[in-house]
Amino acid sequence: MQRGKFITIDGVEGAGKSTQIDFICSYLAKKNINVVLTREPGGTKLGEKIRALLLSIDTQLMDNDTELLLIFAARNEHIKTKIIPALNRGDWVLSDRFTDASYAYQGGGRGLSIERIALLEQWVLQDFSPDVTLLLDVPVALGMLRIKSRSRKDRIELETNDFFNRVRDSYIKRSKQFPERIKLIDASQTLKETTQQIKVILQAL
């Protein structure tokens, strides 16, 4: 059986990931491809419990190293118990965020050591990597405007614009480091134009 493809989608808050995830799932379904939709942090029973801790406003003062370690603990469980088994079955996996988010949010946003994140990545992922990463890019001001109407913001969404500018800069830097895998998508365009950019990438897989 042919191994499935692993697609990740990432970007700052308000980039429009949820809308494009719906499109990707619909597009692949029309191609008779079975898609396992998942997310990080989360994706497993244990991962979802860790996600709740990470996003709760009650843990707003969590130490940055603790945050990073919890994310990679959830990621280890996610990869080994959900992602790899699905790929081995021949399913495609679409994950809302993956390791690039750790470099952007914990590395760029929090200012944690990139070398430390890389060590955790090597330990948990080894040589495992997405086939393609769709990086939705929007100016932070536009992203914040898009999420302004959300009734309740989580612990991360409550961060400052300066934080998210650092996150965005880190994402763009990652896309330049890994241009073959990370496809930078201008998500400030219209929904139709953004979707078309993604469609072209999917057709090449």
Curated annotation (Swiss-Prot):
GO BP terms: dTDP biosynthetic process; dTTP biosynthetic process; dUDP biosynthetic process
Residues that bind ATP: 11-18
List, in alphabetical order, the Gene Ontology terms for molecular function in this entry.
ATP binding; dTMP kinase activity
Q: Name one Pfam family in it.
A: Thymidylate_kin
> GO CC terms for this protein?
cytosol
Q: Which domain of life is it from?
A: Bacteria
What InterPro entries does the record tag this protein with?
Answer: P-loop_NTPase, Thymidylate_kin-like_dom, Thymidylate_kinase
Tell me the keywords, alphabetical order.
ATP-binding, Kinase, Nucleotide biosynthesis, Nucleotide-binding, Transferase
Catalysed transformations (reactions)? dTMP + ATP = dTDP + ADP
Q: What EC number(s) does the entry state?
A: 2.7.4.9
Q: What does this protein do?
A: Phosphorylation of dTMP to form dTDP in both de novo and salvage pathways of dTTP synthesis.
Q: Which family does it belong to?
A: Belongs to the thymidylate kinase family.
Provide the protein name: Thymidylate kinase
